[in-house]
Amino acid sequence: MPTEEHQTYRELPMLPLRGVLVFPYTVIHLDVGRKKSINAIEDAMLGSKEIFLATQKEAQTDEPDEEDIYEVGTVAEIRQILKMPGGTMRVLVEGLFRAEINAYLANDPYMKVRVEELRDKKIKSPELEALMRNLVGQFEQYVRMSKKIPPETVVSVVAIEEGGRLADVIASHLNLRINEKQRILELSDINKRLNYLCELLAKEMEVLELERKINIRVRKQMEKTQKEYYLREQIKAIQKELGEKDERSSEVEEFRERIKKANMPKDAEEKAFKELERLEKMPPMVAEAVVVRNYLDWILSLPWSLETRDRLDLKAAEAILDEDHYGLEKPKERILEYLAIRKLAKKMKGPILCLVGPPGVGKTSLGKSVGRSLGRKFIRMSLGGIRDEAEIRGHRRTYVGSMPGRILQGMKTAGSKNPVFLLDEIDKMTMDFRGDPASALLEVLDPEQNYIFSDHYLEIPFDLSKVMFITTANSVFNIPRPLLDRMEIIEITGYTEEDKVHIATDYLVPKQIKEHGLKESNITFSEGTLRRIIREYTREAGVRNLERQIASICRKVARQVVEDKDTFVHVASNSLNRFLGAGRYRYGVAESENQVGVATGLAWTESGGDILSIEVALLKGKGNLTLTGKLGEVMKESAQAALTYVRSKADELGINDEIRDKYDVHIHIPEGAIPKDGPSAGITLATALASAMSGLPVRSDVAMTGEITLRGRILPIGGVKEKILAAHRAGIAKVLLPVENKKDLAEIPAPVKRKIKLVLVSHMDEVLEETLLKLEAIQPGEDFPGVLLNPELVGENLNQDRVEPEANKDLC
């Protein structure tokens, strides 16, 4: 609002200011760089050299609008312009008087406004005089406290007689926020302006007083530190004269005694003494002294010569292994062999074993049992997800917070140089720009190198040759070949159903009853119940999920016992739905009838073996092949090879030309959501194709596995034990295997061998002889589900002579 009787307006270019406010009666430099601002300056220079200065509400706004600018500003006169590099300019302006925006007249090429002058009234009163004196006194005290304002400024301020001008000049010298300065600019009442400025000045002096006290306190602390350092040096000199030892000397002497008693190798001892000499020469407060002290602590905490005595009693060790784990004969046998050799040969390098098997078969817990059976310390290190090489070898001491790798950290924890060291999930490591931890493990797991294992932090060799390293993995395919070559692979296959029943009865059920606070008198499981849990509620090679299901039943029984509903519960097979709900898995069983175009194969998965039905249908077409069931590339190629073989043997199989050339073949493997791959279904595919194209049914009690070539040769496959166990579980009477897999039959449990007839075959002709039913065996009017026999085709088959290959079977 104007303070004069007549309102005075001016039309002026406007310069929006960012982060700065110009008061009347002040001279200030402004750096101008925005295009519109430069245009406003240039236009003002062409006229009266007056320009309106208004501050933006937000300094970050590059292109301010009307609502982004405070309405009250200062009319200033341009005194000087200096053009700077980059198209900017430095402008010297002098504030003249307050003004308020009345209207915006233009926005381009610069902002032009009509402003209303707000000149101060020239009045005098006792109250105004008192306020001015108080403000001047406060300002003088502020100048003395801040020491940032020249004393000459006080002289010029004291000479000001107008209250409004006094407030503006003093406000321009204070370090205030923009909103506080803007309020001073907007206060047209001089008394209110002086009062508000006195309040702000009082707050600023309080802040300065606090800063002064803080500075004094910091200075005293620094003086105290320097004084303490000086006194310590004096104490050292006095103690030296008296022949006494100071704290640093005592620490150094303690380290020296520990190094002598550590019984370290010569090179490690020399390194330790060298670092101790460095520590002795360093001032106590130097940061490097802490690094050296930590380094010496690490060296002295490692078990350079400490060993635990092995328990060489083979019977006791075997009893411990059998107590903790059922089955697992191969790894147990290998551990006992190691004990026997240790008993005969005192000096022997520790073995490096790799236990490979599906989840839940007891690989990790077996490592702990090995440590217990040998009487050694046990250390476990999980490698899953590790991608930094420094996790194995440590960080160099040049890095802040460096420390040894997890190998030496484990050795420190063990406190002996011959622990059982379990490297869990070695197939789950990854690599990135920080290095490859698998490559770093080569030195750890190589018996020819690990006796001089060098950690980046220690930089001295440490002997790992007496450590018994055991690694675990679910698959060897993800382990780098050089690393795999350094380990002794022991495969732990899945448990049979009989094994799982035995483990559940003797281990899992008693364990869960105890963990849930129950007693054997509260709950019992029948054998049929355990079998149904295994078949319908779990699908795994191990027993982890089986234990989980048993625990679920125990929880429900525990609740019943607490609620006094039942004090004894017998978990019967027919009551499982009440405890666990409906079965989750389809239990694979053999086909009940002989069918045309349907053959039973065997599959090997991470959860063990399973049976695999293969279905073939013929459709009129052009001889094309269609494959469904989410098959992998290898399996698709096996199907193509099987079809080629069957077509090449069309005459011998009694397949007429029309069926061979004018019918499309559709091969489907059920459970289409599950990916399937591998070459071992080759002979099963060929059998199903031969059956569909010849019209001869396939025996439903026969399962088979093997890779086929175009000439009909049968190549060996993997997972023999798991596949035969799956066939036994499904009720298969006969299994056909490649003759080259005869060596794998030694792993098959004797009870399974007695119940299944194992036939070794080397050529596809032998497979067809064992699987396809001769047409003479078909009873008149008998029908085979799945594919209807073509009467004409049957007639042709009956009239053709079949080539019967000589039997070349190896029965087991």
From Swiss-Prot:
Catalytic activity: Hydrolysis of proteins in presence of ATP
GO annotation, cellular component aspect: cytoplasm
Domain Lon N-terminal: 12-205
Catalytic residues in the record: S680, K723
Domain Lon proteolytic intervals: 593-774
EC class of the enzyme, as a word: hydrolase
Induction: By heat shock.
Tagged with keyword Cell division: no
Major localization class: cytoplasm
Pfam families found in the cross-reference section: AAA, Lon_C, Lon_lid, LON_substr_bdg
Sequence positions that bind ATP: G357, P358, P359, G360, V361, G362, K363, T364
GO terms, molecular function: ATP binding; ATP hydrolysis activity; ATP-dependent peptidase activity; sequence-specific DNA binding; serine-type endopeptidase activity
PROSITE patterns, A to Z: LON_N (PS51787), LON_PROTEOLYTIC (PS51786), LON_SER (PS01046)
SMART domains: AAA (SM00382), LON (SM00464)
Record-level GO BP terms: cellular response to heat; protein quality control for misfolded or incompletely synthesized proteins
Cited function: ATP-dependent serine protease that mediates the selective degradation of mutant and abnormal proteins as well as certain short-lived regulatory proteins. Required for cellular homeostasis and for survival from DNA damage and developmental changes induced by stress. Degrades polypeptides processively to yield small peptide fragments that are 5 to 10 amino acids long. Binds to DNA in a double-stranded, site-specific manner.
PANTHER family: ATP DEPENDENT LON PROTEASE FAMILY MEMBER (PTHR10046)
Protein name: Lon protease
Upper taxonomic lineage: Bacteria, Bacillati, Bacillota, Clostridia, Eubacteriales
